[in-house]
């Protein structure tokens, strides 16, 4: 668990992203938030967006943000039976996974920011979808496939296979175009990272 901060404020008032990554499947949730959210608001969002879909985790690793070290946050997780651990600087098991995910998310946002014209929070679900349906070398598959045991049906494929039925559906067309754009940006960013690593 970690936050991406310093983002431009959207018309909805969101200015940060709460990143939550499953250690086993590498699946991630990107939740648009206001940096001013209280720990109580974060706890409500956590139950609504994480616990309801995945149940209560055995353990959580987060950075040492004051909200995660607060008495309230600790008591909520103690009541749920979740062990809290805090990342230690330069310890790859605790801080590496979220940091890599956040770096990928930041790269995706930077690549798409001009295309989304200040409404990054509206496209965040599609960015999350694209991230979770992209191949991860560390697990040998996409996080979605690791989580659900099958590949995900994608709007990109809906458009390609049933084009005649869906052409009139503007929402599907816009969603498909956004997912394709995000995937292209991800590929470009990934190529740049690979090129940089290869030069080392």
Spans of features found by a protein language model:
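Integrase module of LTR retroelements
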Residues: 1-200
């Amino acid at each position: 668990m970690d936050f991406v901060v310093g983002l431009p404020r959207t018309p909805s008032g969101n200015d940060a992203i709460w990143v939550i990554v499953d250690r086993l499947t590498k699946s991630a949730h990107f939740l648009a938030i206001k940096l001013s959210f209280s720990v109580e608001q974060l706890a409500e969002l956590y139950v609504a967006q994480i616990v309801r879909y995945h149940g209560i985790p055995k353990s959580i690793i987060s950075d040492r943000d004051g909200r995660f070290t607060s008495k309230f946050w600790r008591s909520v997780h103690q009541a749920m039976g979740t062990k809290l651990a805090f990342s230690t600087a330069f310890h790859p098991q605790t801080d590496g996974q979220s940091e890599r995910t956040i770096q990928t998310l930041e790269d995706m946002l930077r690549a798409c920011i001009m295309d989304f014209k200040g409404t990054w929070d509206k496209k965040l679900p599609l960015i999350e979808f694209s991230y979770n349906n992209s191949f991860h070398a560390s697990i040998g598959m996409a996080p979605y496939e690791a989580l659900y045991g099958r590949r995900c049906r994608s709007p990109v494929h809906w458009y390609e296979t049933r084009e005649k039925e869906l052409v009139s559906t503007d929402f599907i067309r816009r969603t498909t175009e956004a997912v394709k754009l995000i995937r292209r940006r991800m590929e470009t960013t990934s190529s740049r990272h690979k090129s940089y690593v290869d030069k080392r």
